[in-house]
Curated annotation (Swiss-Prot):
InterPro entries: AcrB_DN_DC_subdom, Acrflvin-R, Multidrug-R_MdtB. Pfam families: ACR_tran. It is a multi-pass membrane protein. Keywords: Cell inner membrane, Cell membrane, Membrane, Transmembrane, Transmembrane helix, Transport. Gene3D superfamilies: Multidrug efflux transporter AcrB pore domain, Multidrug efflux transporter AcrB pore domain like, Multidrug efflux transporter AcrB TolC docking domain, DN and DC subdomains, Multidrug efflux transporter AcrB transmembrane domain. GO terms for cellular component: plasma membrane. It is found in: Cell inner membrane. Induction: The mdtABC operon is transcriptionally activated by BaeR. It comes from Escherichia coli O8 (strain IAI1). Belongs to the resistance-nodulation-cell division (RND) (TC 2.A.6) family. MdtB subfamily. One of its GO terms (molecular function) is xenobiotic transmembrane transporter activity. The gene is mdtB. This is Multidrug resistance protein MdtB. Part of a tripartite efflux system composed of MdtA, MdtB and MdtC. MdtB forms a heteromultimer with MdtC.
């Protein structure tokens, strides 16, 4: 048994060194808790930071954009505008569809928002059109969030109407019930219906009108209560043949009598089973299909939701006929899993590299095993805390753990190195452990709390970016805290049991060679340091130059928001001339599909044409291009997009806009390109004046590409100019005119067929095959007050005009969105500045306001707060260090190392061609915490040497630098190698991880070289300043 000197207290580590069994069991408990926590943690791409978002869709077939705006959208907007917690309200009113997107404050629970939306819809019900086929429908989903899964349902033997009916009743409803699913949309528009196509000439010859037919159909098909008979002994429920279920029954319907002979519907119309809306279509690759897009609720876990869908699919497909095929075209979780797996691999690689560095420096297997236990234990223990905080395993938390690999090993290295030094001097292992751990305990606490202080400002970042990095910061802080605990408990205990003079002195050829190499390096460093200390002002000028250089680099480096990820899915919008019909657009879409599917990187394609909740007009089509896995294609998504756009440019009459889907979705509307800029006015006339002028200037800017606008005011309109006097004389009202037009051309839903499983519509329209275009208006007939039939042309003139294809609002005012991409040789910061400069040259009137939207707006907000964030991190660290050292001066000495890290990080980013984005900024903030460790280790030992050995400040700092050179170099290389796998990552999601690694590696290299020389010089300068200040105060006191 070793006899311990009385001074060998060991500080806070003594209890754990002396009780190895208790310490071991405590560490086993941390390990088990972490393993259990890891298995319980959900997996996602990023932390769940979605805004509470609700979409309200109202369909009114046949209504123009102007009617939809005034009769549907505006009443709803007025009610929604009164809700508390509403952050932004945007709407899009197009032909037959109104879509309102409500984005609420991050602090408002989605369920509370849902209740408010339902109450507002109820309040607006009486203000909406009485013939609205269906009330407004809301869904808890962000329309700009790409679907988590896309499925295509096809059949070679069944019509699409039957396929959609089965999908809607048997598949979509079941998927909608899965927890986390926000909305299941069916694209393809093939809902079954009975279509009644009136022969205008036939009903005119019989003296009938479309209104006569509509009234007859409506009255012949009803489904209402009839009562029951309650007799003395039996009760009988009343029923009747009041419903018609098939097209054949409708053909036989008598709509009128002439000369005693019945006129049946089949005599004046073509009645057939068909689709409810014939102007909708969807395709999977080149095959017509029903496409199911599954979107998640904001905040729902994407992995567990997708897994639940996958588990249910076999059961659902078994309920369908064998000729019906269900294909999963895209699953976002495939890339998310691959990205998380790559990050996990990089984490393991970082651990292996760090352990290798430890062996290289310590040259001793027992000494290497000790931190080899400490590093994984600290990281695994973090998972237990993550579970209690409702975190997930995602790219950011795994990045935090990967970076933490270099952090957490520092503490263990510092402890082992200090204990080993005493063992090599001849101390017994137990005594050395107690003495070394006690001596280094304060340093470990200083390192830990000063590093955590750097992370505190991240917790106070505002808006969605702050929420995004909350998990990153807390995960890293927890890992650092656990590391400190392990380093003060397990590490010294293992050193006392595993290290000995024999094991440390035992050398092989490698250890002897490396020892000589390190001795030569330390000797060279000592000579260089002596020269530097003899020329302090030159060194100080270098330090000041790095500060100036860091500011200049900060100003000139290209700035961005969030790295553009390659998730293997591309969203696209196909734009054709504004007067394009559905048939024309469908043909163009097929031409484009042929071109896209020839690209070797494309795996599948879904496309949609028609007006619904996601597509505003007939002249546009939505595309989703699913790429092959990254390891099966040669190019990343940006090169694929450029290649596809070049190929599609050869298709005449269409423009294709493409953008890669991203894990982080801040936008609330589906835009054509990545970034948005809005013009908002009090009237549409103001927009029609200024939007074209601004577009012309923006399209000339080299900083922008793919500039487009959703302002489309050249849609063809047949304006029916009714002579009201003539109409009134004949007893014809404007309501009669509107009804006649709606009956003929609005695909009017006039009746409902009820079944046990679903409801189907009866659609009324004119058969216009023989009278295309404006000539069809000549066939319209109206009934006068005396029962006569009056041609529409006798009381109205038809004028062709232009009008908007859709009317968009932002917070109830007209708005247009200009979308743009950023070319490869420019940054988002360049594009934003160019737009702002262009706007100033236009001198826009006061009634027009401009604003960036989505990720561009978030970029502006993040850029504005970045400098304050870094300042806050520095101030927080100064306060913590000042408290720990009870000094105003020493924290400044420690913080003087920071400019060198900034210069290294910014230079590395510029050399690598990376932007200074949010991820890179987080790396710079972490560097603030890392590089000051070098100064802390030097200053701690210098102060101890001055205090305990009576050394002069110069001798003390010189000895401290030589004494701590090896652990400083070791810890810096460990942190560098912890970040290296992130810098070199090439797999799925590498774009997200690489800026963090580049910035940290560059900052660590430059700071390591410079701070070894600048820190001791600044330490001595501040020491002289302190002495001078004290002497001045002393002189003043003597004179007083």
């Amino acid at each position: 048994m070793q006899v311990l000197p009385p001074s060998s207290t060991g500080g806070p580590s003594r209890l754990f060194i002396m009780r190895p069994v208790a310490t071991t069991l405590l560490m086993v408990a941390i390990l088990l808790a972490g393993i259990i926590g890891y298995r319980a943690l959900p997996v996602s791409a990023l932390p769940e930071v979605d805004y509470p978002t609700i979409q309200v869709v109202t369909l009114y077939p046949g209504a123009s954009p102007d009617v939809m705006t005034s009769a549907v959208t505006a009443p709803l907007e007025r009610q929604f505008g009164q809700m508390s917690g509403l952050k932004q309200m945007s709407s899009q009113s197009s032909g037959g569809a109104s879509v309102i997107t409500l984005q609420f404050q991050l602090t408002l629970p989605l369920d509370v928002a849902e209740q408010e939306v339902q109450a507002a819809i109820n309040a607006a019900t009486n203000l909406l059109p009485s013939d609205l086929p269906n009330p407004p429908v809301y869904s808890k989903v962000n329309p700009a969030d790409p679907p988590i899964m896309t499925l295509a349902v096809t059949s070679t033997a069944m019509p699409m109407t039957q396929v959609e009916d089965m999908v809607e009743t048997r598949v979509a409803q079941k998927i909608s019930q899965i927890s986390g699913v926000g909305l299941v949309t069916l694209s393809g528009g093939q809902r079954p219906a009975v279509r009644v196509k009136l022969n205008a000439q036939a009903i005119a010859a019989l003296g009938l009108t479309s209104e006569t037919v509509r009234t007859a159909i409506t009255g012949a098909n009803v489904n209402s209560a009839k009562g029951s008979l309650d007799g003395p002994s039996r009760a009988v429920t009343l029923s009747a043949n009041d419903q018609m279920q098939s097209a054949e029954e409708y053909r036989q319907l008598i709509i009128a009598y002439q000369n005693g002979a019945p006129i049946r519907l089949g005599d004046v119309a073509t009645v057939e089973q068909g689709a409810e809306n014939s102007w909708l279509g969807a395709w999977a690759n080149k095959e017509q299909a029903i496409v199911m897009n599954v979107q998640r609720q904001p905040g729902a876990n994407i992995i567990s939701t997708a897994d639940s869908i996958r588990q249910m699919l076999p059961q659902l497909t078994e309920s369908l006929p064998k000729s019906v095929k269900v294909t999963v075209l895209s699953d976002r979780t495939t890339n998310i899993r691959a990205s998380v797996n790559d990050t996990q691999f990089e984490l393991m690689m970082a651990i292996a590299l760090v352990v290798m560095i430890i062996y290289l420096f310590l040259r001793n297997i027992p000494a290497t095993i000790i931190p080899g236990f400490a590093v994984p234990l600290s990281l695994i223990g973090t998972f237990a805390v993550m579970v209690f905080l409702d975190f997930s395993i995602n790219n950011l938390t795994l990045m935090a753990l990967t970076i933490a690999t270099g952090f957490v090993v520092d503490d263990a290295i510092v402890v082992i190195e200090n204990i080993s030094r005493y063992i090599e001097k001849g101390e017994k292992p137990l005594a050395a452990a107690l003495k070394g751990a006690g001596e280094i305990g304060f340093t470990i606490i200083s390192l830990t709390f000063s590093l955590i202080a750097v992370l505190i400002p991240l917790l106070f970042m505002g808006d969605i970016v702050g929420r995004l990095f909350r998990e990153f910061a807390i995960t890293l802080a927890v890992a650092i805290l656990i590391s400190a605990v392990v380093s003060l408990t397990l590490t010294p205990m293992m050193c006392a049991r595993m290290l000995s003079q024999e094991s440390l002195r035992k050398q092989n050829r490698f250890s002897r060679a490396s020892e000589k190499m390190f001795d030569r390096i330390i000797a060279a460093y000592g000579r260089g340091l002596a020269k530097v200390l003899n020329h302090p002002w030159l060194t100080l000028s270098v330090a000041l130059s790095t500060l100036l250089l860091s500011v200049l680099l900060w100003v000139f480096i290209p700035k961005g928001f969030f790295p553009v990820q390659d998730n293997g899915i591309i969203q696209g919008t196909l734009q054709a001339p504004q007067s394009s019909s559905f048939a024309n657009m469908a043909q163009r879409q097929r031409q484009v599909a042929d071109v896209i599917l020839q690209d070797p990187a494309v795996q599948s394609l879904t496309s949609f044409v028609g007006v619904d909740g996601t597509n505003p007009s007939l002249n546009s089509a939505r595309l989703q291009i699913n790429l092959k896995p990254l390891d099966e294609r040669d190019d990343r998504v940006q090169k694929v997009i450029a290649r596809l756009q070049t190929a599609v440019d050869k298709v005449p009459g269409v423009d294709l806009f493409l953008q890669p889907t991203q894990d982080l979705t801040i936008d609330t509307q589906v835009s054509r390109t990545q970034y948005q800029f809005t013009l908002q006015a009090t009237s549409l006339d103001a927009l029609s004046t200024w939007v074209p002028e601004l577009m012309e200037k923006l399209q000339q800017l080299p900083q922008l590409s793919d500039v487009s606008s959703d302002w489309q005011d050249k849609g063809l309109v047949a304006y029916v100019n009714v002579d009201r006097d003539s109409a009134s004389r004949l007893g014809i009202s404007m309501a009669d005119v509107d009804n006649a037009l709606y009956n003929a051309f609005g695909q009017r839903l006039i009746s409902t067929i009820y079944t046990q499983a679903n409801q189907y519509r009866v659609v009324l329209e004119h058969n216009t095959e023989n009278t295309p275009g404006l000539a069809a208006l000549d066939t319209i007939r109206l009934t006068s007050s005396d029962g006569g039939v009056v041609p529409l042309s006798s009381i109205a003139k038809i004028e062709q005009r232009f009008a908007p294809l859709s009317i968009n609002h932002l917070d109830q005012f007209p708005v247009t969105t200009i979308s743009f991409n950023v070319p490869d040789n420019y940054s988002l910061g360049d594009a934003v500045q160019a737009i702002m400069d262009t706007e100033k040259t236009l001198n826009l009137p006061v009634d027009i306001t401009t604003q960036f939207q989505g990720s561009t707006l978030a970029f502006q907000s993040a850029l504005g707060s970045t400098v304050w964030l870094i300042v806050a991190a520095v101030v927080a660290m100064y306060i913590v260090l000042g408290i720990l050292y009870e000094s105003f001066i020493h924290p400044i000495t420690i913080l003087s190392t920071l400019p060198t890290a900034g210069v290294g990080a910014l230079l590395a980013l510029m050399i690598a061609g990376s932007e200074l984005d949010v991820i890179a900024i987080i790396g710079i903030i972490l560097l603030i915490g890392i590089v000051k460790k070098n100064a802390i280790m030097m200053i701690d030992f210098a102060l101890a040497a001055e205090r305990e050995q009576g050394m002069s400040p110069r001798d003390a700092i010189y000895q401290a630098c030589l004494l701590r050179f090896r652990p400083i170099l070791m810890t810096t290389l460990a942190a560098l190698l912890g970040a290296l796998p992130l810098m070199l990552s090439t797999g799925v999601g590498a774009e997200l991880r690489r800026p963090l690694g580049i910035g940290m590696v560059g900052g660590l290299i430059v700071s390591q070289v410079l701070t070894l020389f600048t820190t001791p010089v600044i330490y001595l300068l501040f020491d002289r300043l302190a002495l001078w200040t004290k002497s001045r105060f002393a002189r003043h006191e003597e004179e007083a």
